[in-house]
């Protein structure tokens, strides 16, 4: 994530950024988020979610319980869950289990919410968050270099487009 992304997001109407990579081992960051500052001085609230962005079917409640156990000192938290790749969607099974856990949990207030509400709540705490004025790179440099067949086909397609453009120009000059 280049620092230039901040300016693009801010000038596109975003005020916050939720991400999962790079991981803590690669890029240590404050656990409660930070203000990410772009090259031009643009600022957005940023937060790296913990525990990935999904949960296997029937494991969302366990994910919440684990987070609560591992973060007793935190007053505000964000736990993403859903079945499927890249977050997926909520399952009825998980919703029922989470609702049952909410009903019996006396130690914490747990609500179904949105990232936007999380960032609004963070802002409302008026906690001064650290500022980061640099990239969040580098994450998995060259991770797509092993996709040689895809790259070869893409290059072939690019060259075909150049040929079609030349043929169209020649046809136009010939009045065709």
Regions found by a protein language model. Give the residues of each.
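Catalytic-domain carbohydrate-binding cleft regions of carbohydrate-active enzymes
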Residues: 1-176
């Amino acid at each position: 994530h280049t620092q230039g992304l901040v300016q693009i997001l801010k000038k596109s109407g975003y005020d916050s950024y939720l991400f999962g990579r790079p991981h803590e081992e690669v890029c240590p960051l404050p656990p409660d988020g930070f203000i990410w500052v772009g090259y031009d001085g643009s600022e957005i609230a940023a937060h790296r979610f913990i525990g990935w962005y999904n949960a296997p079917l029937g494991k969302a409640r366990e994910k919440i319980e684990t987070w609560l156990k591992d973060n007793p000192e935190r007053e505000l938290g964000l736990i993403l869950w859903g079945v499927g790749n890249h977050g997926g969607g909520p399952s009825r099974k998980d919703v029922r289990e989470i609702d049952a856990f909410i009903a019996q949990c006396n130690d914490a207030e747990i609500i179904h919410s949105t990232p936007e509400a999380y960032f609004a709540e963070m802002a409302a705490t008026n906690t001064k968050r650290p500022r980061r004025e640099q990239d969040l790179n580098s994450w998995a440099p060259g991770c797509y270099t092993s996709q040689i067949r895809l790259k070869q086909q893409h290059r072939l397609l690019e060259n075909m487009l150049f040929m079609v453009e030349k043929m169209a120009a020649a046809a136009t000059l010939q009045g065709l």
